[in-house]
């Protein structure tokens, strides 16, 4: 008697699903209805989570979101001359002109640079999307942050130097905060979400007078920016390079690239709260004599290595590259050409079961087509109106 997939005992099914790579999630869900249901009730496909880097970024020429994957074992294998970088476009958003990509708690926030005043929140693991209407038609001129409060209610912070608003997923509404964020942040420094709160690198205006740089955090429970937290290094010049990352969104990781001393340091928090922080050195790499603007990175604590993404600033080689740095000084260069926008280099991704739909899930592509159709009708109406107007004027004066 042949046993069907749907007849397998639960413990065996869970064991199978735990060993499948996350890149095979689609195949798992199409196997049978039972497996599809299980994959949406719990996180499966953990088989090679510790062996691969999975992230999302955006293409430079097409402004569309794509997923990317790096095999960490392959990176460490010196016998492998060419490390495979798996990049796939997300067809679901092929119609969107993306401007920025933000990440928190398994959710991606996609910001367009179009005038329909909408942003998109997407849970790649559950396949859910949510369109959010912004109050400002120039929403693409803001910066954003994702987070959640003590009740696990997710929110979006939308801010610039003059205005600060917050969106509540539960109430599906925006409100203006009575604070003005005096953020002197470098556009290439990505903020990072840790335990629901967002941390920003804050650079002071005058080196040597007060704090040259610190961590400014936004508390999504209190809906306030809170006091600056000290960094584990001293910034000596404005062009010293700082970047942020995280470990499973539980520990903040900060990278300091001191060009003058040709030294790169990476530190990990042993404690992180809105009002307190402590640090431990992860690795220090000396004699790093390459002019390199770090914009994104991730670390593997077990393998004791870091993969640092960024852009070479040398006149001979202006391209997007990654350096693999190990505890023993191991260094390997991965050249990605011009695939990525420097400020949108990969964000590390971990799946989550956060449900973001409210009522019927909206189709991003259908909404995009609807907006284009509406714009086309408006332009057509204006064009016809102009023709009628000029025809009338001509008939009067002839």
Curated annotation (Swiss-Prot):
Disulfide bridge positions per record: none
SUPFAM superfamilies assigned to the protein according to its UniProt record, in alphabetical order: F-box domain, Galactose oxidase, central domain
Domain of life: Eukaryota
All residue ranges annotated as the F-box domain in the record: 2-56
InterPro entries (alphabetical): F-box-assoc_dom_typ1, F-box-assoc_interact_dom, F-box-like_dom_sf, F-box_dom, Gal_Oxase/kelch_b-propeller, SCF_F-box_component
PANTHER family linked to this entry: BNACNNG10540D PROTEIN, F-BOX PROTEIN CPR30-LIKE
Protein name: Putative F-box protein At1g67450
Species annotation: Arabidopsis thaliana
Organism classification: Eukaryota, Viridiplantae, Streptophyta, Embryophyta, Tracheophyta
């Amino acid at each position: 008697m042949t046993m069907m997939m749907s007849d397998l005992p639960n413990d065996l099914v869970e064991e199978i699903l735990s060993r499948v790579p996350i890149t095979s999630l689609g195949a798992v869900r199409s196997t049978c209805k039972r497996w599809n249901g299980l994959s949406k009730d719990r996180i499966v496909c953990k088989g090679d989570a510790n062996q691969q880097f999975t992230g999302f970024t955006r293409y430079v020429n097409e402004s569309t979101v794509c997923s990317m994957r790096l095999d960490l074992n392959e990176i460490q294998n010196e016998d492998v001359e060419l490390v495979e970088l798996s990049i796939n476009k997300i067809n679901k958003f092929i119609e969107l002109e993306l401007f920025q990509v933000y990440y928190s708690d398994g959710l991606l926030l996609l910001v367009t640079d179009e005038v329909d005043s909408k942003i998109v929140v997407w849970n790649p693991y559950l396949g859910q999307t949510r369109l959010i209407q912004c109050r400002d038609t120039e929403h693409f001129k803001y910066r954003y942050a994702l987070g959640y409060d003590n009740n696990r209610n997710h929110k979006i912070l939308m801010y610039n130097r003059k205005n600060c608003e917050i969106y509540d997923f539960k109430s599906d509404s925006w409100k203006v905060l009575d604070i003005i964020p005096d953020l002197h942040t470098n556009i290439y420094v990505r903020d990072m979400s840790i335990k629901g709160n967002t941390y920003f690198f804050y650079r002071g205006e005058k080196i040597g007078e007060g704090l040259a740089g610190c961590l400014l955090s936004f508390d999504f429970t209190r809906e306030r920016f809170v006091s600056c937290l000290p960094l584990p290094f001293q910034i000596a010049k404005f062009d010293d390079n700082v970047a942020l990352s995280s470990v499973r969104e539980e520990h903040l990781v900060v990278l300091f690239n001191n060009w003058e001393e040709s030294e790169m340091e990476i530190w990990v928090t042993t404690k992180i709260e809105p009002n307190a922080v402590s640090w431990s050195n992860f690795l220090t790499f000396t004699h790093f004599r390459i002019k390199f603007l770090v914009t994104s990175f991730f670390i593997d604590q077990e393998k004791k290595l870091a993969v640092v993404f960024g852009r070479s600033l040398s006149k001979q080689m202006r391209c997007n590259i990654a350096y693999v740095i190990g505890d023993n000084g191991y260094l390997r260069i991965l050249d990605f050409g011009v695939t990525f926008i420097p400020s949108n280099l990969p964000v590390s991704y971990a799946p989550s079961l956060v449900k973001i739909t409210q009522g019927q899930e909206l189709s991003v592509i259908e909404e995009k087509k609807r907006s284009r159709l509406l714009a086309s009708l408006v332009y057509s109406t204006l064009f016809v109106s102009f023709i009628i107007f000029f025809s009338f004027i001509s008939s009067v004066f002839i």
